[in-house]
């Protein structure tokens, strides 16, 4: 069905169920139908929001006052409790069922990892400095310093690992401004690399705030949080929600390059294993960790 066609509109308004990974699932025009639905003008079908990641920050636009849903699928227990208690939906709307896409992630995640470290920082919002001004940001300077760190390069050689730098897709327009002097460090983008495959292949994840860390934790791989610009990040990005990285995170929080490299070396020395403390947090955060998420979601939709 061609998006935005008459047939698309016809099917959209006649469907019994509208199921998708984003709000206003299956809508011919997401933003138009989002605003129409907020005013009570919406399709007759049951609205099912599968989600494509775990919510951790405050997202006012997903509250009931701005969004109608019949089923709000949650991927983690604390996320479900946060949405249930603060987003204003009827008690039966949010359900902890697990993310549908994680069934395949868990199956594929049984394969051995590569000796690869994935460095994946997230974006900084639509109003972050652009062009030449980008080089003056803490994001650029911290990431560039790490990519060219002799200490990192020596570590990669010593432990026979590579590092793949894959910034958020909204930051990849700046990728040409980064450079490295090590043959073991790769600058990657969405044209040449698949995110899901990178997450499966990596032995360890370094990120700042990217929610991909939930995927890596779900696979019980070690991760490090390199939060070099916390105050600046909150200025341009979402406000913090229920998730506290130091209390709830699945790896240590590092605010300096030195602390990050010390934590990285310790993890390399330990054979790239997730420490027991963080495995326990993972188990508490994802009590449903099997390959039955799709089945649970299907049953929930049938019960609407």
Locate the predicted segments by residue.
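Acidic, amphipathic alpha-helical patches
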Residues: 8, 152, 194-195
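C-terminal alpha-helical cap of glycosyltransferases
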Residues: 289-304
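A short, gly/pro- and small-residue-rich
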Residues: 30-52, 136-145, 221-232
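Active-site and donor-binding regions of nucleotide-sugar-utilizing enzymes
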Residues: 1-106
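Short, charged/polar "capping" segments at the starts of alpha-helices
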Residues: 27-29, 80-83, 104, 127-128, ...
């Amino acid at each position: 069905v061609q998006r935005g066609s008459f047939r698309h509109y016809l099917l959209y308004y006649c469907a019994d169920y509208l199921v998708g990974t984003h709000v206003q699932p299956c809508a011919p025009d997401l933003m138009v139908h989002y605003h129409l639905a907020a005013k009570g003008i919406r399709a007759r079908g049951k609205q099912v929001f599968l989600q494509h990641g775990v919510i951790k920050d405050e997202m006012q636009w997903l509250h009931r006052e701005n969004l109608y849903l019949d089923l709000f699928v949650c991927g983690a227990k604390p996320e479900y409790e946060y949405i249930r208690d603060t987003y204003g939906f009827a008690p039966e709307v949010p359900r902890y069922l697990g993310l549908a896409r994680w069934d395949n992630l868990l199956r594929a995640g049984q394969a051995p990892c590569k000796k690869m470290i994935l460095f994946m920082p997230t974006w900084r919002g639509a109003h972050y400095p652009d062009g030449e001004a980008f080089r003056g940001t803490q994001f650029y300077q911290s990431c560039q310093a790490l990519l060219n760190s002799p200490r990192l390069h020596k570590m990669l050689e010593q432990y026979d690992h590579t590092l793949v730098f894959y910034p958020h897709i909204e930051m990849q327009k700046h990728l040409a401004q980064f450079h490295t002097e090590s043959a073991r460090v790769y600058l990657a983008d969405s044209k040449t690399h698949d995110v899901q495959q990178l997450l499966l292949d990596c032995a360890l994840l370094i990120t700042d705030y990217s929610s991909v860390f939930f995927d890596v934790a779900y696979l019980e791989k070690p991760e490090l949080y390199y939060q070099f610009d916390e105050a600046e990040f909150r200025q341009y990005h979402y406000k913090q929600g229920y998730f506290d990285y130091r209390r709830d995170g699945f790896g240590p929080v590092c605010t300096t390059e030195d602390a990050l490299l010390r934590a990285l070396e310790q993890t390399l020395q330990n054979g790239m294993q997730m420490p027991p403390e963080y495995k326990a947090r993972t188990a508490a955060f994802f009590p449903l960790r099997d390959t039955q998420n799709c089945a649970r979601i299907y049953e929930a939709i049938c019960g609407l």
